[in-house]
């Protein structure tokens, strides 16, 4: 039986926020385990990433409408609902409310369903608070861009307020999926051809020769990913191996390695003479490292 998309999204959000799951990996796992059509996959992914990315902003919008103490999971459910209300124009308000109330009743009984119903209906009849009215510019940026204030303070000290805001704006921009081409398996052109044969749109990166920007269905379903020709990795993480300028005989220690993308990238550069030791303080994260190693 296929679960409701918003119920799946809520479970995934809780895994990420409460259990420390990696957002990209958990999303891909859920998409692999559930038969969703393309529209539902897109909605699920948007809700999860959006709620996690904007949780401070969403809590700012929620705060005026919460008059009594609510449970943490109810707050997170309301964040998810507010994200849809504020940022997703095509989702009807009644659908947002009805789905949230059903999830609340299922997880916590009728009382929690009534709480969620009352808060959302009151919010949708009211004006949302405006973070532009916050006098302190650093506090305003922390809420508007959903970033911990201590980071804002640190950046403002080093870069000034204007440059800090430019940096923050970049974090909310929509970015394409990036993958790292494993050039020990095939040439870049051959890997691009494999991806295109599977129906992906592929664009070479301007800075890193092994970084590819792709569009299409989730890459984890592709033969290129399963056979180790590409690995999911953010471009910023790829720069680590690039700027290290390692020698092929080097022995590198990655002491906080999970999920292992950077360690595997360095290993690809060092093959076959060099060595990488990848470790992590959390035993349960070692499986993630081993998963990536097996694809080398």
What are the residue ranges of the model-derived segments?
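S-adenosylmethionine
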Residues: 1-296
């Amino acid at each position: 039986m296929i679960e409701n998309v918003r119920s799946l999204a809520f479970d995934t959000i809780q895994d990420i926020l409460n259990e420390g799951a990696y957002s990209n990996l958990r999303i891909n796992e859920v998409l692999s385990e559930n038969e969703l059509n393309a529209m539902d996959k897109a909605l699920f992914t948007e809700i999860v990433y959006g709620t996690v990315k904007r949780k401070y902003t969403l809590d700012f919008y929620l705060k005026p409408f919460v008059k009594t103490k609510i449970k943490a999971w109810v707050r997170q459910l309301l964040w998810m609902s507010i994200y849809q209300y504020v940022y997703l124009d095509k989702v009807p308000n009644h659908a947002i409310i009805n789905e949230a109330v059903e999830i609340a009743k299922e997880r916590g009984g009728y009382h929690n369903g009534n709480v969620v119903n009352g808060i959302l209906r009151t919010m949708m009849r009211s004006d949302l608070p405006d973070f532009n009215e916050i006098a302190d510019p650093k506090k305003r940026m922390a809420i508007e861009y959903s970033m911990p204030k201590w980071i804002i303070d640190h950046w403002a000290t080093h870069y000034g307020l204007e440059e800090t805001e430019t940096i923050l704006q970049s974090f909310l921009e929509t970015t394409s999926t990036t993958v790292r081409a494993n050039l020990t398996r095939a040439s870049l052109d051959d890997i691009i051809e494999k991806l295109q044969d599977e129906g992906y749109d592929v664009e070479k990166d301007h800075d890193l020769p092994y970084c590819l920007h792709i569009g299409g269905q989730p890459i984890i379903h592709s033969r290129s990913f399963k056979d180790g020709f590409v690995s999911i990795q953010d471009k910023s993480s790829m720069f680590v191996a690039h700027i290290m300028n390692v020698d092929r005989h080097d022995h590198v220690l990655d002491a906080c390695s999970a999920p292992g993308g950077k360690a595997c990238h360095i290993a690809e550069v060092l093959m076959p003479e060099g060595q990488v030791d990848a470790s992590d303080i959390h035993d349960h994260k070692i499986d993630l490292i081993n998963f990536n190693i097996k694809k080398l």
